[in-house]
Amino acid sequence: MSRIVEPPTQRQGARRVWSDSRGRIWVAEWNSGNLSMHDPALGMGANSWRTWKAPGADPHVYAVYVDDQDIVWAAEWSNNAMLRFDPGSEKFAVIPMPRPAANIRQILGRPGEVWLPESGTEFISVIKTG
């Protein structure tokens, strides 16, 4: 059965979601510039959500992906960067993209790699994680 789960941030502009190995749902919020996580094990209320503001000036988070180590990757358009978020430490690392206006709309990967198709440049970047 499917059910609608609304992020708690008003008009957040959710763009992409990805789940981790624990079944938590990670959400890229374009309008708010947040990375949010919903934990269904905690129910449907406000306490089932956690939210982190992406670093940088006026962030816009578009795509999100969780790798095989449960590290969360997010594309941040305003600062043309990839964000690496460690849920354990709750810290972001910022990785600038090598080409202007990469505009990553979807992130994929396999163990040891994160694939970044750049819709703005028609390149594919790969980050080696292992």
Predicted regions and their residues:
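Conserved beta-strand positions in repeat-built beta-propeller and related beta-rich domains
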Residues: 25-31, 72-78, 116-120
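A short loop-to-beta-strand structural motif that recurs across blades of beta-propeller domains
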Residues: 34-37, 81-83, 123-125
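Beta-rich, blade/repeat-based domains predominating
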Residues: 8-24, 56-69, 100-112, 121
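Intrinsically disordered, low-complexity linker/propeptide segments enriched in Ser/Thr/Gly/Pro
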Residues: 1-7, 26, 35, 39-41, ...
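Ankyrin-repeat and related helical/solenoid repeat scaffolds used for protein-protein interactions
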Residues: 65-114
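A short beta-strand motif characteristic of beta-propeller blades
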Residues: 2-7, 48-54, 91-96
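Short loop/turn segments that connect beta-strands within beta-propeller blades
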Residues: 39-44, 86-90, 128-130
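Long terminal segments
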Residues: 107, 117-120, 124-129
